[in-house]
Amino acid sequence: MTLVDRLRGAVAGMPRRLVVGAAGAALLSGLIGAVGGSATAGAFSRPGLPVEYLQVPSAAMGRDIKVQFQSGGANSPALYLLDGMRAQDDFNGWDINTPAFEWYNQSGISVAMPVGGQSSFYSDWYKPACGKAGCTTYKWETFLTSELPQYLSAQKQVKPTGSGVVGLSMAGSSALILAAYHPDQFVYAGSLSALLDPSQGMGPSLIGLAMGDAGGYKAADMWGPKEDPAWARNDPSLQVGKLVANNTRIWVYCGNGKPSDLGGDNLPAKFLEGFVRTSNLKFQDAYNGAGGHNAVWNFDANGTHDWPYWGAQLQAMKPDLQSVLGATPGAGPATAAATNAGNGQGT
């Protein structure tokens, strides 16, 4: 019996309210990682791109953090691409599942893909992040807003401010929160298929289930109990006023759970996208209500919780990113042997 069959059987005959809650809990707890999440065609960029594998010191986390990096040229702006809940420790999901480095080669934008951070929400946790693999320190916000930009500025001639940040699923809300609290660094934030009201309703409980499944982590170690102010602090729908006041350029995408020819025609991918769509519409209402006028909204007539849709959005936003960040297309090394290459599949 497949995972999807077990899910169908478990909810058969249940009242609709309980079906939605149970299915949402199951899917948000990581089943998408097991039965969905197909890669974009041509995943991993072609060999010969100037991609480097950096080991960036982090005093906040007490270790070096691997960052996949492609230069956009001297004094170029940066684009930080953040991974999903099941982020791996070998490569960033954007590289595993899409040819993102190839798409942005010669774009005038330096691309930085931090590696790791499973279930982290790219946040500074209250407590050590203890999971199935042991305990570590998660201070991702500090790393992304202080340590990494300082390193890239000093070592790679990347502008430390005026950057963009784009995340999918878990990291979509993270991208908006990073921009809300660090407006000089992140003038552009993209959220793709994210839950944008995580502190509200069943959000804390579902996130706790998801983190438990994706690595065995505890949400309370991250932001405390659901009544803790950290939950509201990291809720984009409650911090939308900051994005409006900052005049941050935002790009928000969410499908409706109906697959297109891009793929993702499986129950978890379809259900999860439909599940998070409501929070995206709610966020749009809050943004407009706060007087926001610097947003791109892509609420498509199709789209499931899957990489081909996120890859299409990253390609679509490229001209907008270049314009907002002031990139100079054509800047940066055209081709080079990858530094410390490790995946043998292109980067």
Curated annotation (Swiss-Prot):
Disulfide bonds join C130-C135. It comes from the Bacteria. Substrate binds at M85, R86, S169, D197, F275, V276, R277, T278, K282, H305, D306, W307. Residues 1-43 form the signal peptide. Residues 326-347 are annotated as: Disordered. One of its GO terms (cellular component) is extracellular region. The keyword DNA repair does not apply. Residues 101-111 are annotated as: Fibronectin-binding. Keywords: Acyltransferase, Cell wall, Cytoplasm, Disulfide bond, Secreted, Signal, Transferase. The active site is at S169 (nucleophile), E273, H305. Its main location: secreted. The antigen 85 proteins (FbpA, FbpB, FbpC) are responsible for the high affinity of mycobacteria for fibronectin, a large adhesive glycoprotein, which facilitates the attachment of M.tuberculosis to murine alveolar macrophages (AMs). They also help to maintain the integrity of the cell wall by catalyzing the transfer of mycolic acids to cell wall arabinogalactan, and through the synthesis of alpha,alpha-trehalose dimycolate (TDM, cord factor). Homodimer. This is Diacylglycerol acyltransferase/mycolyltransferase Ag85A. It comes from Mycobacterium avium.
